[in-house]
Amino acid sequence: MIFSTLEHILTHISFSIVSIVITIHLITLLVDEIIKLYDSSEKGMIAIFLCITGLLVTRWIYSRHFPLSDLYESLIFLSWSLSVIHIVPYFKKKKKNLSTITASSVIFTQGFATSGLLTEIHQSAILVPALQSEWLIMHVSMMILSYAALLCGSLLSVALLVITFRKNRNIFCKRNPLLNELFSFGEIQYMNERNNVLRTTFFSAKNYYRSQLIQQLDYWSYRVISLGFIFLTIGILSGAVWANEAWGSYWNWDPKETWAFITWIVFAIYLHTRTNIKLRGANSAIVASIGFLIIWICYFGVNLLGIGLHSYGSFTLTSN
């Protein structure tokens, strides 16, 4: 009873902190100069991480099994994994300009998990026979860690595409017929030369910053996705061994397994494109962006179906 109450308290605290951090992030998007707000949001992310950790430990003790048996528990663990990816660069004092992407992932996932939409599966239950195995921690944790890393890496690639393909607004008009009537040829030539100098200086600084940001996004998306791909491979292989012990077959092509294989193929293609210098950058980022959608279909969309050998981790949306 005590652990159940503590879990309930931590759930509401984490949701409250998420709401506060969302507000702070919205303010920092409007006012970039307020450094104290940025520090407050980062401290809020650390508080969220501590709450999620306490929530997982409490549920583990209360349910007497590792909290990865259903969608709600896996969402909490996914939030924890995303928060780890977020706070590690923060403590190393690196890549603050990339923290907004990882922070948004944590806020969205934890906010959804604790918002009350999954109230029906919040209560802990006895594990079904298929999950009463030592492979539960190995397989499911590796899969969730891979989802977290691949989602963050894919979001970095999406940001890379947005910055790359965003068109520059031409703040200086190239031709103006009215100038030809009001000014002489020499005056027009002088004004054009001055505008060209200003425009060149402005866009040179802007393009330099943009190129540096694109390089950072490309660099970190590749490394985070590579880490996630390793986790995904380990998760699929451990799941195959577990499936052979439980069902007598390494692979059964149920919806979850099929989409996990599709996810693996997509990110294998991404890593393959990275070996070609000509395909790096925007081309490989497009593949990673496709992978972002595939991950959500594999992790969340398949659970809505409630069919297949992994149906015990699903849920159904019911109306009152």
UniProtKB/Swiss-Prot annotation:
One of its GO terms (biological process) is cytochrome complex assembly. The chain crosses the membrane at residues 15-35, 43-63, 71-91, 98-118, 143-163, 224-244, 251-271, 285-305. It is a multi-pass membrane protein. It is found in: Plastid, Chloroplast thylakoid membrane. It comes from the Eukaryota. GO terms for cellular component: chloroplast thylakoid membrane; plasma membrane. Its main location: plastid. GO terms for molecular function: heme binding. Keywords: Chloroplast, Cytochrome c-type biogenesis, Membrane, Plastid, Thylakoid, Transmembrane, Transmembrane helix. Belongs to the CcmF/CycK/Ccl1/NrfE/CcsA family. May interact with Ccs1. Required during biogenesis of c-type cytochromes (cytochrome c6 and cytochrome f) at the step of heme attachment. This is Cytochrome c biogenesis protein CcsA.
